[in-house]
C-alpha cells in the first residue's frame, strides 16, 4: 500500500477509519498498564485521533507519527491548540507542551525520538496494513520501542474475503505468530462489534470482532 493511497484518502476526506469518539477499549483498559503520569507514550499512524487527547489528559507525553500533513494539521485545528512546527530530519515536527507529532514515514522515523518511550498505543496502525506489509510494520514498531515498553493493541478481525480493507482483518493467530518474538502478549478482551459498524453490515460481513491486547516489549 503506497503513501499516495493515504494522501488521497485524507485529501478526499474519505476517513471512515477515523473515530469520532475515544476508543472504549482505551478508556477501559489503559489503566491496566499501571503507568506514571509523566510517561512518554508512542502512537504510531496516529492520524487525528482523539485518543491522543485522552492520553494527554492522563498526564502522559504523547509522541505520534503520521504520514499525512493534513491529518496532523486537522488534529491541532480540531482541538484548538496552537502548535510549533520545526523540521527534524525527514520529518516535520508539530508540538505543544504535551503532544509531539512527527509527520512523515514511520519507516524512517529516527529511533532517538522514541528512546525515552515506555508505553505505546496502537489502535489504527496494525490494521491499516495489508497482510503483505503488516509484518514489516510490526518489526519496525518493535525496533522503535525500548525493551520493557508496555502497550495497548486494538485489532479488528472479520472474514477478509467479505470486505476489502482498510481496516484489514488481523486474527489472534496472526498476532501470536508475528508479534510473539518481540512482545509478551496478553489478551484483555474480544467482543462482537458488528452492530456498531454500518459499513460492515452494508457489505453483509457476517461477523466483526474487536480485540484488545496488552503487549510488553521483550
Swiss-Prot record:
GO terms for biological process: methylation; response to metal ion. It is found in: Cytoplasm. GO terms for cellular component: cytoplasm. Gene3D superfamilies: Vaccinia Virus protein VP39 (3.40.50.150). InterPro entries: SAM-dependent_MTases_sf, Thiopur_S-MeTfrase_Se/Te_detox, Thiopurine_S-MeTrfase, TPMT. Its EC number is 2.1.1.67. PROSITE patterns: SAM_MT_TPMT. GO terms for molecular function: thiopurine S-methyltransferase activity. The keyword S-adenosyl-L-methionine applies. S-adenosyl-L-methionine binds at residues 10, 45, 66, 123. Belongs to the class I-like SAM-binding methyltransferase superfamily. TPMT family. This is Thiopurine S-methyltransferase. HAMAP family: Thiopur_methtran. PANTHER family: THIOPURINE S-METHYLTRANSFERASE. It comes from Shewanella baltica (strain OS195). The keyword Transferase applies. Its main location: cytoplasm. It catalyses: S-adenosyl-L-methionine + a thiopurine = S-adenosyl-L-homocysteine + a thiopurine S-methylether. Keywords: Cytoplasm, Methyltransferase, S-adenosyl-L-methionine, Transferase.
